Amino acid sequence: MKVAFWSSVRGKSCVTSNLACMGILASLDSANRQRKTILFENHHNLMNLESSLFSEFSKDQVREECQYEGYRGMEEVLYAVEKGHIYSSREIFQNARGCLGEKLFYLPQKREGNPDIFEYRMSRDCQAVLQYLERYNDLVMIDTSCSFLNSSRRILEEADLVVVNLFQNEAALSHFFSNYSNIRKKAFYLIGNYEGDSCMTRGEILKRYRIPGSHL
């Protein structure tokens, strides 16, 4: 199953931290030791999933010490897809960082990589990459950029479920619910940084935009 985490507003809805938490919960909740979840993002950002899951310094981050060398991450997966190589599950997971008893994996990006080249390759091969990862994982979870990237558009199209991280701002909410009807058909909603004193409470959002209570 492919699950995209996304927001229409940059930097306000805690998309990355929400995805990291949900990935961990999905892995811990699984009684099946063979069940695997893999995470990645389609954009470059210093505050990424890797910093949330594997930070060695912050006590506020969920983390686990790991010592893995030699992985090339998402670039290696893109290369395999580009060349038509068929990797085994072992080869896929060798390019990822694993934790939680090898049930949760993260595909990193090269920190010194060119973001424009990465976006071009991800946009071109997005469908094949997702199919590739889904072959060996029960859950593929993507931190999807809110920027107007072609790869973001394609990921949102390919995802089985889109977790929309809402920002409690009336204008931002109105813009989303007026312009993204294609996403709403397969959306589940989170309020990433909930403010109890906001006029746009959970109840108000449910009522105004006619969202089923089980979807927020």
Give names to the regions the model predicted.
Residues C14-V15, F118, A172:
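Secondary-structure boundary/capping motif
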Residues R121-H215:
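Conserved catalytic-core segment of NTP-binding enzymes
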